[in-house]
Amino acid sequence: SQDDGLRLRAAQFLLENMADKGYLTGRSIEEYYNFIDSVYQIKQEEYDIPYIYATFRQQAKYLKENPVLNWDVQTLSADYLIQNIDEAFAVWNRPWNRHLTFEEFCEWILPYRVGTEIPEVWRALYRERFEPLLMNDSIRTAQQACKVINDELIKLPIHIATQSAMGLCLRPSTLINIKFGLCGDYANLALDDMRDCGIHVGI
């Protein structure tokens, strides 16, 4: 069918663009993610961000261990890519993106991650939280959909850090609970969110 043909081309697009994509793993990386995930569970008005990062550096056991570079093309499974393709196609029928060409869809909605964060299955997590906001027949354009999502994101705690304890792209499951972070962290959160809702965006 035509749909199967497009999905095959989508898979080819991802594979052709994977050659130089990678991510870091290791005990130091996992330790940092666990620390940030735990801190993001704390709700308060203000955060002493330099103190929080200094605490991590003091407590970290594996900070000096070199992480391992993993290449997407060698580590991501076919099932992972297929699930991402299926979930991306599921939102390519919204009023605000039906006009997109296949090439535009591949460029703006299909990608499975933003930067060098650890790849994970993230779209369902974001869809559950944000898609209900767009279930309104009056939302017809990408600009309208984008405003709805932005209005919701602005309600999140926004505390901008000038540096982080480790220069990592945070994974989507961490970002969705953000309490503070780099400007890029908030931008990546918005991109993940809008991409999952079928709003064509990029950085």
PLM region descriptions:
Residues 156-160:
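A short secondary-structure junction motif
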Residues 1-147, 151, 155, 175, ...:
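N-terminal accessory/pre-domain segments preceding catalytic cores
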Residues 140, 145-152, 163-173, 179-203:
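Hydrophobic/aromatic-rich core segments of domains that either
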